[in-house]
Amino acid sequence: MSKRKFLIITLALAIAFLSLTSLVILLKSNTVAEDLPKGSEWALVVDGFVRNPLNLTYGEILVMPKTTVYAELYCVDNPNFAITKGNWTGVKLGFILERAGVKSDAVKVVFRSQDGYTSDLSVTTAMREDIIIAYELNSQSLPETLRLAVPGKWGYKWVSRLAHIELVDYDFKGTWESRGYSDEADIP
């Protein structure tokens, strides 16, 4: 094979790889602990500064109005510099927060994963139309039950294995935010 043909094939493969991320890459970069609750054992709790605390099963979330957003997930600490691109499908976070009835003194939304990881968004940001609680990527079920999808924000805001949403009246800082990472996490 000529050097030119080799370079063309290599370039074509690289472009194909970067154009659409498969669920396999997401699986490799997000190990799911086997002992974490799944199925009927699992529920998403929404509480704190809300009028109507919620305890939602996976099935209840699946029958809520769904939306799909195209977004790119950029992990800050991924050694492979992988970018997960695609169509994320789920429920608008704002829909769930409205159902819970956010109290006026709430300033932050705290997200907790099943393994204790945390992140946060301001209440205003959390109500954006494009922020969803995703259960599918490119029409395939996510392996980690639910993931917060936050377009335009670094991956540490995209909490996977989401289990608890709490509204608080103080400036909470999540796992990485409390270590000096930007609380806004905007991708330039």
What are these regions (language model features)?
Residues 2-188:
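N-terminal intrinsically disordered, low-complexity segments enriched in P/E/S/T
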